[in-house]
């Protein structure tokens, strides 16, 4: 298995004409079983042949796939590959080492049904300043649009596809959405007044017509363990952002509440 720390994620190596016996005796930081090369190469066909070795994260449970493939440069020979799995914990980097915003909580995203849309963690954004600074002079943002558009936030953080937490912030900063999701007036706490409508809109945004609140809530529960969003005890459909949104966004919750004319929620 391709599990040695010195292996790079992906490398391409062109082999010089050598015998198959010499090839099998080579060591790349670790020994590979003889079964790895199922079809011994013929000396006359080695010129221009190459192997690719690749490791990539393929599952939410932090497993890694190692793959070695054989092919011929410019030739018609079909590829063959052998795969192995290994833990990729050692490949991941901590949030503090990736971002200058050391005080921020790790803000990952989650969708157990279509994981390629959701990277396991928020990429470190290279922009200077807060999101508020980032969008201050953007002409497309105006009073008739959300204060925090998900697409703009995704661009600012460099996260790629729009993530659930970004989408929720968009809805929460759009006055036209206050009938089904809104701030309660208590810091970063918010309530899904109509969770089915929130799920429907999330499904529409991600082109997933079968999305419902049960599926969406699984993503929210994933955020519990990551200390991004917590469920408010004793209140139905009430949640709270517990990560450091203020440092990321550049807004304090009271500022957003005032911009959106949020009235304190008196419901128990």
Swiss-Prot record:
Q: Does the keyword Magnesium apply?
A: no
Protein activity control? Autoinhibited by a module composed of four alpha helices (HI-1, HI-2, H4, and H5) that flank the DNA-binding ETS domain, reducing the affinity for DNA.
- The organism's place on the tree of life at top rank: Eukaryota
Keyword Chaperone applies: no
**Keyword annotations from UniProtKB, A to Z:** Cytoplasm, DNA-binding, Nucleus, Phosphoprotein, Transcription, Transcription regulation
Q: Which InterPro entries match?
A: Ets1_N_flank (IPR045688), Ets_dom (IPR000418), ETS_fam (IPR046328), WH-like_DNA-bd_sf (IPR036388), WH_DNA-bd_sf (IPR036390)
| Pfam families, A to Z | Ets, Ets1_N_flank
- SUPFAM superfamilies (UniProt xref): Winged helix' DNA-binding domain (SSF46785)
- Where does the UniProt annotation locate this protein? Nucleus; Cytoplasm
Q: Which residues bind DNA?
A: 162-242
Q: Tell me the GO BP annotations in alphabetical order.
A: cell differentiation; positive regulation of endothelial cell migration; regulation of angiogenesis; regulation of transcription by RNA polymerase II
Helix HI-1, as annotated region:
131-139
Stretch list, region Helix HI-2:
150-157
Coarse class of the primary localization is nucleus
> GO CC annotation: what is one?
cytoplasm
Location of the region described as Helix H5 in the Swiss-Prot/TrEMBL record: 253-259
Question: Quick one: where's region Helix H4?
Answer: 245-249
Q: Tell me a Gene Ontology molecular-function term this record carries.
A: sequence-specific DNA binding
Can you state the subunit structure given in the record?
Binds DNA as a homodimer; homodimerization is required for transcription activation.
> What function is annotated for this protein?
Transcription factor. Directly controls the expression of cytokine and chemokine genes in a wide variety of different cellular contexts.
Q: Which family does it belong to?
A: Belongs to the ETS family.
Spell out the protein name for this chain.
Protein c-ets-1-B
């Amino acid at each position: 298995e391709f599990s040695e720390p010195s292996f790079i994620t992906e490398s391409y190596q062109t082999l010089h004409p050598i015998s198959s016996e010499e090839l099998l005796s080579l060591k790349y930081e670790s020994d590979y079983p003889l079964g790895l090369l199922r079809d011994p190469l013929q000396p006359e066909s080695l010129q221009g042949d190459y192997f690719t070795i690749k490791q990539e994260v393929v599952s939410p449970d932090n497993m890694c796939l190692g793959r070695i493939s054989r092919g011929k440069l410019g030739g018609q020979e079909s590829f063959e590959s052998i795969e192995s799995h290994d833990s990729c914990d050692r490949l991941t980097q901590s949030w503090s080492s990736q971002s200058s915003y050391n005080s921020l909580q790790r803000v990952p995203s989650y969708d157990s049904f279509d994981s390629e849309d959701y990277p396991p963690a928020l990429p470190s954004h290279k922009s200077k300043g807060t999101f508020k600074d980032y969008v201050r002079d953007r002409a497309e943002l105006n009073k008739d649009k959300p204060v925090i558009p998900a697409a703009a936030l995704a661009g600012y953080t460099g996260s790629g596809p729009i993530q659930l937490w970004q989408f929720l912030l968009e809805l929460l900063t759009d006055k036209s959405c206050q009938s089904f999701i809104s701030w309660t007036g208590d810091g970063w706490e918010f309530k899904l007044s109509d969770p089915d409508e929130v799920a429907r809109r999330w499904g529409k945004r991600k082109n997933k017509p079968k999305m419902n609140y049960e599926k969406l809530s699984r993503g929210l529960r994933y955020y519990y363990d990551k200390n991004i969003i917590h469920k408010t005890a004793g209140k139905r459909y009430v949640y709270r952002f517990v990560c450091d949104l203020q440092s990321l966004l550049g807004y304090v919750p009271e500022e957003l509440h005032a911009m959106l004319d949020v009235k304190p929620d008196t419901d128990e």
